[in-house]
């Protein structure tokens, strides 16, 4: 892919490359009920594809346990490259691991005590690893890796009906989205729109405020 091509073109032959997808259990990107399909994607053929043609969902960091694994690998790699700084890197990792464990526990307590285990996104959905980690079900306008931004009337109608049928009080959108799909659903259902931050992008204002994965 493009990352491999950039890495191969680097003049730094000592550069270490860490592939996050190779460190954790990964999931294929999926098309759920009501979801707008990828360009050229035929949902009827889903059961016929194999690993060679699968598209992996790359948003592995949305599960805090995966974030711990990835952070540990980064710390280990830095410690090997700069042995004198080993204690510094590993010390920082231990502090960060504690923050991630605390975050994971907060999520588990919140979800264990929630009235519902279902979320609806009027947007793309790059959070499969998150919902798998915490036993949530979801419905969304698009899968996480699509470039599509305009859902069909059928998809919007499905999500509106789902909100009404399941008495969902909140529609989620993701950071830096215009939120138009979620707003349309909310207007038709009397619900409110909230932003779910996927730690994929960050606004200039949030960056300057020091917002992080665990904040």
Q: Model-predicted segments: where are they?
A:
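Extracytoplasmic metal-acquisition and chelation regions
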Residues: 1-215
């Amino acid at each position: 892919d493009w990352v491999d091509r950039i890495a191969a073109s680097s003049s730094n032959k000592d550069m270490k490359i860490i592939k996050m997808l190779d460190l954790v259990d990964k999931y294929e990107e999926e098309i759920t009920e009501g979801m707008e399909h990828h360009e050229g994607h035929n949902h009827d053929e889903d059961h016929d594809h194999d690993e060679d043609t699968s598209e992996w969902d790359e948003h592995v960091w949305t599960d805090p346990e995966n974030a711990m694994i990835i952070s540990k690998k980064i710390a280990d790699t830095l410690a090997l490259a700069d042995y004198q700084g080993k204690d510094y890197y590993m010390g920082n990792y231990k502090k960060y691991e504690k923050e991630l464990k605390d975050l994971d526990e907060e999520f588990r307590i919140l979800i264990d005590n929630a009235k519902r285990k279902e979320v609806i996104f009027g947007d793309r959905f790059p959070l499969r690893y998150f919902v798998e980690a915490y036993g949530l079900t979801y419905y969304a306008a698009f899968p996480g890796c699509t470039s599509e931004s305009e859902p069909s009337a059928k998809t919007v109608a499905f999500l509106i009906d789902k909100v009404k049928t399941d008495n969902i009080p909140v529609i989620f959108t993701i950071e830096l989205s215009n939120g138009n799909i979620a707003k349309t659903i909310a207007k038709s259902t009397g619900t409110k729109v909230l932003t779910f931050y996927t730690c994929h992008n960050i606004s200039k204002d949030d960056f300057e405020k020091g917002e992080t994965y665990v904040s």
